[in-house]
Amino acid sequence: MESVRLLVLVLALLWSPGASGLRFIGDLRMDLSAVIRRVDRSFLSVTVDASLAAEEKFMSLLSSAKVRTLAKALSPSFLRFGGTRQDFMEFSPQRSHQDSGSTEDESCDQLELPSWLENQLKKAWTKQQLTLMREDLHRKYRRVKFTEDTVDLLNSFSVCSGMDLIFGLNALLRTDDNIWNSSNAGSLLQYCESRRYRMSWELGNEPNSYEKKAGVRVDGLQLGRDFSRLREMMSQSEFYRGAGLFGPDVGQPRDRRVDLLEGFLKTGSEAVDAITWHHYYVNGRDTSLEDFLDPEVLDSLALKTKEVLEKVRLVSPEKPVWLGETSSAYGGGAVGLSDTFAAGFMWLDKLGLAAKLGLDVVMRQVFIGSGSYHLVDENLDPLPDYWLSVLYKRLVGPEVLKVEFSSVAQRKRVRLYLHCANRKSYQSGAVTLISMNLSQKPVWISVPARVSSSTVEAFVLQSDRPEEEGLYSRCVTLNGVVLKMVDDRTLPDLKGTRLPPDEHLQLPAFSLAFFVLTDAGAPACK
C-alpha cells in the first residue's frame, strides 16, 4: 500500500525549570493512499429549533436578508426543524390550499423581512426567550398551533438558502391505545404536497424523555410501528414517495434509551433512511470552562458513538447513522460558554471525531432559536462557531484519511484530523489538516522535506483577547483579523495565509486551525 509517512516534528515551548526551550514531542503519520471513511456531502448540517414557532410571528426572522446570507454560506446542508416543542405543536390550517402562499418560483428578494419589522422582532425575541427558558426549567410546555405561514417560511428559507428541509412531526399525538394518531400529520403532508414543497420528515424528538415531559411512555417497538405508519402514508403520496424519513432521534445511550433504540430497530429500521440519535457532552447548568477543554470529555463522544453503531450494525449493517441533534451542553447550552470561543474546541473535535468514527451527518443545534448554543445570536450576528463552520465547509472534503500522532503526552491536547480538501476550493490531491491546541502553550508542526514543495494555506482561529480571558469572548480572529460581516448581505473574505516552503506550521495556544497542503498530491484525493 502506497503510504506517505510525514514526519512532523512537534515542538512545544516549555517553561519548566531547566528546560532548554524546545523539545521533540512526537511524529505524525499520514496515509494519503486510501480513504478510510466518506461522509455525506451535507455532513455539517444545522437545525432551526421548533421554539421559534412557539409564537408564529418569530418565524418571520427566517426572512431576514442577514439570516439568509449567513445560512447560504453553510450550504449544502440539511435543515432540521424540530426539538422538544415539535411534540407539542399541531398543524392548524387557516386557508384553503388554493390561497396564495410562497412558492419556489417567487424571488427570494421578494420575500425579505423589512428592517423595521426585523428590529421589532429581535427586541420581542429577547423577552420570548425568557418565557421559553422558564418552560424548559419546569418542563411545562404549552400546546402550540401553527399555520401554513410556518411551513411557507421554512420552505422559503430552505430553498433560498440552498438547504434541504427536514420537518419534525409531533409523535405525542396518540390514541387511547397509545398508537400514533397520524391525522394531523396527514393534513400537513397534504398541504405541503399541494404547494409542491420538497422536504424530508422526522417523527418525534427524544422519545426517551416523553414520560418526564408529558407523562407518556412509548416503547421502541411501538415507536418503530409508528414510523412504519408514517412511511406508509408517504408511499401513498406520489410527491413524497421517495422523500427521506429519519429517526428515532433518541438521546445518547443510557439505560432505557438503549432499550428504546433496540426496540425501534426491530420494528422501524426498514422505514427510515438513516438512524438518528442526539449527543451533548455536559449539562449546561452544571459545567465549567475546564470541561470544554478536557480531553476526556471530548473523548466521551467516541464511547457513545461506538455503542450506537454496534446496536445499529447488528440489525441494519448498511444503514447510515446520523447525529440528528448535537451541541456542547444540553438544557439549552451553558450560559457564557456555549456561545463563546471556548465552544469551538468541542465543535471542531466533534466534527473530526464523528467523521472518523463513521457518522454520516452531524446536525448542529442550533442555527437560530432559543438557548445559548446557537450559531447566530439574538441580534442575528454570527458567533465563533458559525465562522468555524463556514471554514469547515469551504476547506474540508468528505473523504477521511488516516492520521496518527505518536506522542502520548501531547496527543490529548493537540488534536488532529485529516481529510481530502474540498475539491470545490482546491485542486485534486490537496489535503486539509484539522488542528486544535487545547493547551496554553504554543505548538509548532514542522512539515518534512517529502512535502516541502507543497504550498500551505493556514487558517488559524483565535480569540480576539489573549490567554484564558479570550476563551470567554464572543469574537474570533482569522489569522489575526477579527471576523464580522461586511454588511447584511456580505461575508468577509476568509483568506488563508500562504506559508513558504519548509515553514513550521504554528499552532498558537488555545487555537483552532485548518492547514491546507494544496500540492500534497494525495492519491486518495484524486
State the predicted function of each range.
Residues 280-297:
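Active-site His/acidic residue clusters
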Residues 2-274, 302, 306-324, 328-526:
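Non-catalytic accessory regions flanking glycosidase/transglycosidase catalytic cores in CAZymes
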